[in-house]
Swiss-Prot record:
Residues with PTM N-acetylalanine: A2
Domain SUI1: 115-182
In-chain residues carrying the UniProt-annotated modification Phosphothreonine: T86
Name recorded for this polypeptide: Density-regulated protein
Species assigned in the record: Homo sapiens (Human)
Amino acid sequence: MAADISESSGADCKGDPRNSAKLDADYPLRVLYCGVCSLPTEYCEYMPDVAKCRQWLEKNFPNEFAKLTVENSPKQEAGISEGQGTAGEEEEKKKQKRGGRGQIKQKKKTVPQKVTIAKIPRAKKKYVTRVCGLATFEIDLKEAQRFFAQKFSCGASVTGEDEIIIQGDFTDDIIDVIQEKWPEVDDDSIEDLGEVKK
């Protein structure tokens, strides 16, 4: 007797998936997906490109489009039939106005293009060479730092936003090396400051 009660109470439950199945539906269901937004056509109205989705549906599946327009409210249908082509064009123009430019880049301040080289004393008889101004010629400082470290077989590091420190006294050789590696840096734009204190 208890088995009969549990079976009958299970059939009356609202959340039972067996009761939610439609009797007139043919399983497995065939769902039509939109070619514009890739969602089922019932959900196209929730996407930002409703006009494009409707145009695609009308062009490719006129029967389904007719069903959807009959099911829609008269306000939506009237809005679409009045200016279907112009509404889509207006939406497209609005989107182009809103998003096209992206982030505006700030103009760089015109800084004189000058490379300065200085020899800075460290402890006892040791020196470091400071190279400033390579960034004004749009030279990648990390690449320049690696190049100097490899060329002079020493340590080099990028310390400031436009400053490279090379361990050792290379003020004599570095001018020729810079002009050889980066020909856009001419002899007039390189200035040797000599020995400078930190």
